[in-house]
Amino acid sequence: MQQFEWIHGAWLGLAIVLEIAANVLLKFSDGFRRKCYGILSLAAVLAAFSALSQAVKGIDLSVAYALWGGFGIAATLAAGWVLFGQRLNPKGWVGVILLLAGMVMIKFA
C-alpha cells in the first residue's frame, strides 16, 4: 500500500464532486435534449477522470476507485432526493447500507 498524502486525497475529493456534478447535469440534460447541460456533463466526467488519475498517483487504484464510486453513488442518491424528489424503496436502502459497509471494509483492508 502506498503512503497516503493529503494532496492525493484532495484530488480524490475533487473527482467525487465532479462525478456528482456530472450525474446531476446529465439529469438536467433530459437525455441530451438540453445540449448545454449534456456537454457540461461530459466535461465534468472528463474532469472527474482527470482528477482520479492524479489521485491514484498516491492512493492504491482499488481503494481510490472504490471510494470514488461509493461516495459518488451515495452523494448522487442524496442529490436525487434533494433536487428531484427521488426516493428509494427498502431494497434500495439495503443496497446503500451494503455499499457503505463495503467502502469501510475496503478502507481498512
From Swiss-Prot:
Its main location: membrane. Pfam families: Multi_Drug_Res (PF00893). GO terms for molecular function: amino-acid betaine transmembrane transporter activity; antiporter activity; choline transmembrane transporter activity; spermidine transmembrane transporter activity. The keyword Membrane applies. It is found in: Cell inner membrane. Keywords: Cell inner membrane, Cell membrane, Membrane, Transmembrane, Transmembrane helix, Transport. One of its GO terms (cellular component) is plasma membrane. The chain crosses the membrane at residues 6-26, 36-56, 64-84, 88-108. It is a multi-pass membrane protein. It comes from the Bacteria. GO terms for biological process: glycine betaine transport. Forms a complex with MdtJ. Belongs to the drug/metabolite transporter (DMT) superfamily. Small multidrug resistance (SMR) (TC 2.A.7.1) family. MdtI subfamily. Catalyzes the excretion of spermidine. This is Spermidine export protein MdtI. The gene is mdtI.
